[in-house]
From Swiss-Prot:
Organism ancestry: Eukaryota, Metazoa, Ecdysozoa, Nematoda, Chromadorea
Residue positions assigned to the propeptide: 206-228
Name by which UniProt lists this protein: Growth arrest-specific protein 1 homolog
Compartment(s) of residence: Cell membrane
Keywords: Cell membrane, Developmental protein, Glycoprotein, GPI-anchor, Lipoprotein, Membrane, Signal
Length: 228
């Protein structure tokens, strides 16, 4: 049995390794060689493997992003990160076109230009937006935030079905009120969990396809062992 299992593990590992880009592999190695980044990365590896966009995965991603080497890894193409399909589907990757609102806020707070614009918007407009009101001044302030390179994620950021109120409050009560009826802005749905995704979700399909490729490799190997 051991003679069968060892090559099987090597086959699966090879299938995964062949898809990893050099940039992602370097970023992952750098993170694993740094104790702080490694300690932040371990919970992500464990939590982001259920394909259900759990809060534990979100918290782990936000924790990794607060580390410099972790940010570099998450900003890569993520081809070397286990659970990458879940990270994409849950919008937990900062380089994607649609980003989780809490991750977008964290990225904005780390950028001087975005943070200064967003800080003014929050101080001037948070109270009114919480009541469902948004003045023209507040719309202008939010647009100024969105016009920054990092703040652009606020125009279509999203939450998952299992999110806490911090994300939904930011998306629906603060951003949503002022983005409503804004030309060129399309609000993303809050629910983007894998388990509840519609059948036409390309990201969910890619996740299934990736798993199918691995299972195919395993099936071919086992068939070879049984025949020969």
């Amino acid at each position: 049995m051991r003679r069968v299992i060892l090559p099987l593990v090597m086959t699966v590992t090879l299938c995964l390794a062949q898809e990893a880009s050099e940039a992602c592999t370097k970023a992952l190695t750098d993170c694993e060689n740094d104790l702080e980044c490694q300690n932040r990365l371990a919970p992500l590896m464990a939590a982001c493997s259920t394909n259900t966009c759990q809060p534990q995965c979100r918290s782990a991603v936000l924790n990794v992003y607060q580390n410099k080497l972790g940010r570099i890894l998450l900003r890569s193409d993520a081809t070397c990160i286990p659970g990458r399909d879940e990270l994409r589907t849950c919008n937990f990757l900062p380089a994607e076109s649609t980003v989780h609102c809490s991750l977008g806020k964290l990225a904005c707070e780390g950028d001087l230009q975005c943070n200064s614009k967003f800080g003014v918007f929050m101080s001037e407009c948070e109270a009114d937006a919480a009541r469902g009101a948004c003045t023209d001044k507040c719309k202008t302030l939010l647009n100024q935030t969105i016009e920054t390179s990092v703040g652009s994620v606020f125009s279509n950021c999203t939450c998952t079905a299992r999110d806490d109120q911090l994300c939904t409050n930011l998306k629906d009560n603060l951003l949503g009120v002022c983005l409503k009826n804004t030309p060129g802005v399309t609000l993303s749905p809050s629910d983007n969990s894998i388990t509840d995704a519609p059948g036409g979700n390309d990201l969910a399909d890619s996740s299934v396809g990736h798993g199918f490729n691995i299972l195919s490799a395993i099936s071919v190997y086992l068939l070879t062992v049984l025949v020969f």
